[in-house]
UniProtKB/Swiss-Prot annotation:
Belongs to the catalase family. It catalyses: 2 H2O2 = O2 + 2 H2O. Its EC number is 1.11.1.6. It comes from the Eukaryota. Heme binds at residue 348. This is Catalase-1. It holds the Pfam family Catalase-rel. It is an enzyme of class 1 (oxidoreductase). Keywords: Glyoxysome, Heme, Hydrogen peroxide, Iron, Metal-binding, Oxidoreductase, Peroxidase, Peroxisome. The active site is at residues 65, 138. It is found in: Peroxisome; Glyoxysome. It comes from Triticum aestivum.
Length: 492
């Protein structure tokens, strides 16, 4: 059934003003009163409806990724990957799929400046012939934590102090001092790329490890990457202050203006793949979201290109009501046992049901563009017009049947029930390698940002010592420089 066919806006084109129920409104300027100066009458239904509507215009803000910008376009396959996946939208070079993409900051509120040091969200909804696929990622290829159990605590630590509503370094560094796996993420966040110049000049990553499955059922672990064809650009501190002080929505404006001018943003889509049969060859766990896969060992393979060539028509319906979930996949793409991904599969859909209601997938931006059929009926704000008499399965009165079976990973798993960390933590090697890959000037800026963070007057000597130990294990010279600068810095 076409979800657009019965949407309320299909008849929202009257030349005269009316109420929500369609009654004509002859005066939208004055309230109904007793005389010209008398009290307002409660029977002024139009006034009550208008104010009540206004009072309910805002919906719950996203708990993370509240500040965002959206655009539409297409994804086109440029290289054959049919040997790796049976996904229909990747079936052959030249195949195009419509998409909608949402960029965002992560921690800060809706309306906050787009020049703050913060990860950026990079989420794509592919409207494929086999249903939607949501690839929900960030601009950095790694994350702070590897187990979803810590996600609420992590967000609380990064968010403002619940007493003062001020984001404070002592809270952030206190929490992450218990999680050395966060070091790798901090080599990105405190690097020059921690403040992207705009959304067009920004990398994207699926972050988590997924699985590609071909028609024969062979599975490969996969990492997804987006590289902007116009290159990566970032803002240093002084530039961020200048840009943010001029326009706190500069990245949204840049995206909108560029598309309107025909300067369409474009990214090349790459994958990295690992055969699960050989995952033990690495000194890290391929399912560890705090690790990257070395490109000299696991090379990037080009797959396609993403082009954004249309601005959205309505911010609320195509940004605020737009909803993503890593659990929404298509045949040929599957999950992995990445602990953070496993948590996200539930968390994202759950928060959308809270934010938008149980029928959020019926909203036009979230509904599939292919035909679909199930017995998910009724519920709050279900506006789908259905005239079936059979709302159960199976039935001899309803011709709907199971879809053809498609392959999913078939590995046999065994183990004890237990709560524990992964065996190959290896928390310090990759952060050290990334720091050493920076040129001296970039290293100096990285160190200065850490000196500033570690100089928070509420940080204890113990917490500072832990961070110096962590960075020394990543790179001895880095630890020494941080210790030297901190010891010579006058106390408050």
């Amino acid at each position: 059934m076409d979800p657009y066919k019965y949407r309320p806006s299909s008849s929202f084109n009257a030349p005269m003003w009316s109420t929500n129920s369609g009654a004509p409104v002859w005066n939208n300027d004055n309230s109904l009163t007793v005389g010209s100066r008398g009290p307002i009458l409660l029977e002024d239904y139009h006034l009550v409806e208008k104010i009540a509507d206004f009072d309910r215009e805002r919906i719950p803000e996203r708990v993370v990724h509240a500040r965002g910008a959206t655009a539409k376009g297409f994804f086109e396959v440029t290289h054959d990957v049919s040997h790796l996946t049976c996904a229909d939208f990747l079936r052959a070079p030249g195949v195009q799929t419509p998409v909608i993409v949402r960029f965002s900051t992560v921690i800060h509120e809706r309306g906050s400046p787009e020049t703050l040091r913060d990860p950026r969200g990079f989420a794509i909804k592919f409207y494929t012939r086999e249903g939607n696929w949501d690839l929900v990622g960030n601009n950095f290829p790694v994350f702070f934590i590897r187990d979803g159990m810590k996600f609420p605590d992590m967000v609380h630590a990064l968010k403002p102090n619940p007493k003062t509503h001020i984001q404070e370094n002592w809270r952030i560094l206190d929490f992450f001092s218990h999680h050395p796996e966060s070091l790798h993420m901090f080599t990105f966040l405190f690097d020059d790329i921690g403040v992207p110049a705009d959304y067009r000049h920004m990398d994207g990553s699926g972050v988590n490890t997924y699985t590609l499955v071909n028609r024969a059922g062979k599975a490969h672990y996969v990492k997804f990457h987006w590289k902007p064809t116009c290159g990566v650009k970032s803002l240093l501190e002084e530039e961020a202050v200048t840009v943010g002080g001029t326009n706190h929505s500069h990245a949204t404006k840049d995206l909108t203006d560029s598309i309107a001018a025909g300067n369409y943003p474009e990214w090349t889509f790459y994958i990295q793949t690992i055969d699960p049969d050989y995952e033990e060859r690495f000194d890290f766990d391929p399912l560890d979201v705090t690790k990257t896969w070395p490109e000299d060992v696991v090379p990037l393979q080009p797959v396609g290109r993403l082009v954004l060539n249309r601005n959205i028509d309505n911010f609320f319906s195509e940004n605020e009501q737009l909803a993503f979930c890593p659990g929404i996949i298509v045949p040929g793409v599957y999950y992995s046992d990445d602990k953070l991904l496993q948590t996200r599969i539930f968390s994202y859909s759950d928060t959308q049901r809270h934010r938008l209601g149980p029928n959020y997938l019926l909203l036009p931006a979230n509904a599939p563009k292919c035909s679909h059929h199930n017995n998910h009926y009724d519920g709050l704000m279900n506006f789908m017009h259905r005239d079936e008499e059979v709302d159960y399965f199976p039935s001899r009165f309803d011709p709907a049947k199971h879809a053809p079976r498609y392959p999913i990973p078939s590995r046999t798993l065994n183990g004890r029930r237990e709560k524990m960390v992964i065996e190959k933590e290896n928390n310090f090697k990759q952060p050290g390698e990334r720091y050493r890959s920076m040129d001296p000037a970039r290293q100096e800026r990285f160190i200065n940002r850490w000196i500033d963070a570690l100089s928070d007057p509420r940080l204890t000597h113990e917490i500072k010592a832990i961070w110096l130990s962590y960075w020394s294990q990543a790179d001895k010279s880095l630890g020494q420089k941080l210790a030297s600068r901190l010891s010579s810095k006058p106390s408050m």
